[in-house]
């Protein structure tokens, strides 16, 4: 009987301590809230204050008070007070104030433009899909690949390919797979844009391609485009599965519960 009472008191004490810790976490810190000691616009009874606090009493019309229209008070329009538009106060737009917007004492804190936020979805998509190529209408450049070993049906063509394969592209241009209805359309578009871009770029450097080069280049690029399609399709379905997983109600409830435990 005594042991059960002791266990009950220990449980009550533990719950009380846990509640007190939770309240301490949620209790506002002194000096950091609105109209507290650390506020830029403190109230009449606040321990802290502006850089130029009122110097006198608190009656209206007194020479050193804090009422409206006093010469040395803290009311609106006073020459040495802390109200709005005062030359030495701490209100909005004052040249020597201590905490308002655009004041000299803030050192441009409120005037600095906010930094643009990076969209993490776009960053992740660009990293997974490849870099978007400017001037090619939304095409992306895939990662470098090893040129495949292809047999063209004759010893001459096989030897010619082995001797000239370094002149052919090892990267392909493509668009996201969700813009195509099937693999054939993706590969066809990928081959055309890659061969065209590589041919134009190489020709401007003073190197020309023969009909044999174009034939072999199309075969090589076709194999590379098929590989690129398989990679992109797999990555696309994996991203879709991840979105479905994290959008399911049980997962959302679990994540919300974990966040509640961490924050609370």
Swiss-Prot record:
Cu(2+) 4 binds at residues 96, 98. The keyword Protein transport does not apply. Residues 55-107 have a biased composition (Gly residues). Residues 242-264 form a propeptide. Residues 54-103 are annotated as: 6 X 8 AA tandem repeats of P-H-G-G-G-W-G-Q. Residues 25-241 are annotated as: Interaction with GRB2, ERI3 and SYN1. Cu(2+) 3 binds at residues 88-90. One of its GO terms (molecular function) is copper ion binding. Residues 37-54 have a biased composition (Low complexity). Sequence repeats lie at residues 54-62, 63-70, 71-78, 79-86, 87-94, 95-103. It is found in: Cell membrane; Golgi apparatus. It is a lipid-anchor; GPI-anchor. Residues 1-24 form the signal peptide. A lipid is attached at residue 241 (GPI-anchor amidated alanine). Cu(2+) 1 binds at residues 72-74. Disulfide bonds join 190-225. Cu(2+) 2 binds at residues 80-82. The normal, monomeric form has a mainly alpha-helical structure. The disease-associated, protease-resistant form forms amyloid fibrils containing a cross-beta spine, formed by a steric zipper of superposed beta-strands. Disease mutations may favor intermolecular contacts via short beta strands, and may thereby trigger oligomerization. Contains an N-terminal region composed of octamer repeats. At low copper concentrations, the sidechains of His residues from three or four repeats contribute to the binding of a single copper ion. Alternatively, a copper ion can be bound by interaction with the sidechain and backbone amide nitrogen of a single His residue. The observed copper binding stoichiometry suggests that two repeat regions cooperate to stabilize the binding of a single copper ion. At higher copper concentrations, each octamer can bind one copper ion by interactions with the His sidechain and Gly backbone atoms. Belongs to the prion family. It is linked to Found in high quantity in the brain of humans and animals infected with degenerative neurological diseases such as kuru, Creutzfeldt-Jakob disease (CJD), Gerstmann-Straussler syndrome (GSS), scrapie, bovine spongiform encephalopathy (BSE), transmissible mink encephalopathy (TME), etc. Monomer and homodimer. Has a tendency to aggregate into amyloid fibrils containing a cross-beta spine, formed by a steric zipper of superposed beta-strands. Soluble oligomers may represent an intermediate stage on the path to fibril formation. Copper binding may promote oligomerization. Interacts with GRB2, APP, ERI3/PRNPIP and SYN1. Mislocalized cytosolically exposed PrP interacts with MGRN1; this interaction alters MGRN1 subcellular location and causes lysosomal enlargement. Interacts with KIAA1191. This is Major prion protein. The gene is PRNP.
């Amino acid at each position: 009987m005594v042991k059960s009472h002791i266990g009950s008191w220990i449980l009550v004490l533990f719950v009380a301590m846990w509640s007190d810790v939770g309240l301490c976490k949620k209790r506002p810190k002194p000096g950091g809230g609105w109209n507290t000691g650390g506020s830029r616009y403190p109230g009449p009874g606040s321990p802290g204050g502006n850089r130029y606090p009122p110097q006198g009493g608190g009656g209206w019309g007194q020479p050193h008070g804090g009422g409206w229209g006093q010469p040395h008070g803290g009311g609106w329009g006073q020459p040495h007070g802390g109200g709005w538009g005062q030359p030495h106060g701490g209100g909005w737009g004052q040249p020597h104030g201590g905490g308002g917007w655009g004041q000299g004492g803030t050192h441009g804190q409120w005037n600095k433009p906010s930094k643009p936020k990076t969209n993490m979805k776009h960053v992740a998509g660009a990293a997974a899909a490849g870099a978007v190529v400017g001037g090619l209408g939304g095409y992306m450049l895939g990662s470098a690949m090893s040129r495949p070993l292809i047999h063209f049906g004759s010893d001459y063509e096989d030897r010619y390919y082995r001797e000239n394969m370094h002149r052919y592209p090892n990267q392909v241009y493509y668009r996201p797979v969700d813009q195509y209805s099937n693999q054939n359309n993706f590969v066809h578009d990928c081959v055309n844009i890659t061969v065209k871009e590589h041919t134009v770029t190489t020709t401007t450097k003073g190197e020309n391609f023969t009909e044999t080069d174009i034939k072999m280049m199309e075969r090589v690029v076709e194999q590379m485009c098929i590989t690129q399609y398989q990679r992109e399709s797999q990555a696309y379905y994996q991203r879709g599965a991840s979105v479905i997983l994290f959008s399911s109600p049980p997962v959302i409830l679990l994540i919300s519960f974990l966040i509640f435990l961490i924050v609370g």
